[in-house]
Regions:
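Basic, amphipathic alpha-helical segments enriched in Lys/Arg and hydrophobic/aromatic residues
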Residues: 88
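Glycine-rich phosphate-binding loops that contact phosphosugars or nucleotide phosphates
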Residues: 1-85
């Protein structure tokens, strides 16, 4: 959810976060707008500021999500195996 979800609109997201919380796992996320339920429930949440042109909110937030997830999965401390281009 670009906006981080609400109990009414993003029931699946909220349910997944409740499930994670019940399983004693950490919740991290990246959301736009005000961060919604994700910003409230997450242990760590990057909230991407809403641009002046609100029509760009979704593409900018999703772009930032992609950058942050890529940084996470590529971080040496978190990687479990080399990426394909590192084997060449």
């Amino acid at each position: 959810s670009v906006g981080g979800g609400t109990q009414e609109v993003s029931q699946g997201l909220v349910k997944a976060m409740n499930y994670a919380r019940d399983g004693e796992t950490h919740i991290i996320g990246v959301a736009g707008r005000d961060g919604g339920a994700l910003a409230i429930m997450a242990d760590a949440c990057v909230v991407v500021p809403e641009p002046a042109d609100k029509s760009l909110s979704t593409p900018i937030t999703e772009s930032m999500q992609a950058v942050i997830w890529h940084l996470l999965v590529s971080h040496p401390a978190l990687k479990r195996q080399k990426t394909a281009w590192e084997d060449k």
